[in-house]
Amino acid sequence: MGMGNMNKMMKQMQKMQAQVARLQEELGERTVEASAGGGVVKVTANGRQELVNIKIDPAAVDPEDVEMLQDLILAAVNEALHQSQEMVTREMAKITGNIRLPGF
């Protein structure tokens, strides 16, 4: 591989790194929402897989059945995190051309 090709490849990698850094910043602002129990529990997560909001309909709060509410919260959180990860994977593929980078 000639030096010209090596320099070109290095520039492409630097450009990709800058795009990834910009995307990571943007993903902190993008959100996905998931719900469980017909919408009585709603969870919002950002592209960094951080929960940013949880809403629970007061009708879902039954002191006699706390376990049901816990299950609904878990289901909504897991779905929101799954959607968030899918969003990250899609956006990273646009930059990397489906090259898997560590940590994404």
Curated annotation (Swiss-Prot):
| Matches recorded under SUPFAM superfamilies | YbaB-like
Lineage top rank: taxon = Bacteria
Keywords in alphabetical order, please: Cytoplasm, DNA-binding
Report the locations given in the UniProt record: Cytoplasm, Nucleoid
State the InterPro entries in the record. Answer: YbaB-like_sf, YbaB/EbfC
Give an example GO molecular function: DNA binding
**Gene Ontology CC annotation, any one:** cytosol
TM region positions? none
Q: Assembly and interactions?
A: Homodimer.
Q: Which family does it belong to?
A: Belongs to the YbaB/EbfC family.
Q: What is this protein's function?
A: Binds to DNA and alters its conformation. May be involved in regulation of gene expression, nucleoid organization and DNA protection.
What is the name of the protein in this document?
Answer: Nucleoid-associated protein Moth_0028
Please name the source species. Answer: Moorella thermoacetica (strain ATCC 39073 / JCM 9320)
